[in-house]
A protein has these predicted regions:
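Active-site and glycan-interaction determinants of carbohydrate-active enzymes
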Residues: 92
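Extracellular beta-rich ligand/substrate-recognition surface
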Residues: 71-75
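Surface-exposed loop/turn positions within long extracellular repeat scaffolds
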Residues: 1-62, 76, 80-88, 100-162, ...
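Polar, low-complexity export/assembly segments characteristic of proteins
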Residues: 66-68
């Protein structure tokens, strides 16, 4: 838990490695994920590692697995330096733990994305899945949340699960594009948030790919300037603002 003289690097082959203090894995060298889970301890337990951003040192091979847990329900861990340069093609990202993991990462090399617990957020827009391949599966479990905020959000993936997916923020407008090659088996809550400041140039487009369906969850719209095109939906709609 305590910062130490260990400088790195680190190879995680299996099990769970829990860090409880800033600097616990040193400040140099790659942190290589060959399996297992990296967990941030609950900050309420004593030492606090939530400000310990090791993302620029993460190394995941092609087809690898990046499993991250933030254990504290009120904790937020921000990884600003995660990039395609350190994420192998076809990486599977899994988020567990009751806290929030905030990523500054476009996400376009992900094969699969799973939010089992807590919240996973992508800051400054995101592209998840590569169009037209559309082989990516995004699953958000019941009680968990995926937040995609700011700029352009492209979700070229099959969306599954019963959790909450929030796209946009109250003070920004952007483009939301949801497309996949098959039906979206999502029974949770899809929240579309934005203000459409200039509808002529910054309208919040929500494009469901032609021939695709959105499952029987709830679509909550809180904002203005949203336009729907193509596709079908079996979802219930709630309008929070006009």
């Amino acid at each position: 838990n305590l910062a130490n003289t260990y400088t790195g690097g680190t190879i995680l082959n299996g099990g769970t490695l829990t860090i409880g203090a800033d600097g616990a894995l040193g400040t140099e060298g790659d942190i290589i994920f060959n399996g297992g889970t990296l967990a941030y301890a609950d900050s309420a337990a004593g030492e606090d590692a939530t400000g310990y951003d090791i993302s620029s040192r993460v190394n995941v091979g092609d087809g690898g697995f990046l499993n991250v847990s933030v254990l504290g329900a009120g904790d937020t861990v921000s990884w600003a330096g995660l990039s395609a340069d350190v994420m192998g093609a076809g990486t599977t990202l899994t988020k567990t733990g009751a806290g929030t993991l905030a990523l500054g990462y476009a996400g376009n090399t992900l094969a699969h994305l799973t939010v089992e617990e807590g919240t996973l957020s992508f800051m400054g827009g995101a592209t998840i899945g590569v169009n037209p391949n559309n082989a990516t599966i995004v699953r958000v479990s019941e009680g968990a949340s995926l937040a995609l905020s700011g700029g352009t959000v492209n979700l070229h993936a099959q969306l599954n699960g019963a959790g909450t997916v929030t796209i946009g923020t109250a003070d920004t407008a952007g483009l939301v594009n949801i497309s996949n090659t098959g039906n979206t088996n999502f029974t949770g809550r899809l929240e579309l948030v934005g203000n459409g400041v200039n509808m002529s140039t910054n309208a919040n487009w929500v494009a469901f790919g032609a021939g695709n369906t959105l499952g029987g969850g709830t679509v909550f719209i809180d904002g203005k300037g949203f336009h729907f095109s193509a596709g079908t939906t079996a979802a219930n709609f709630e309008i929070g603002a006009t």
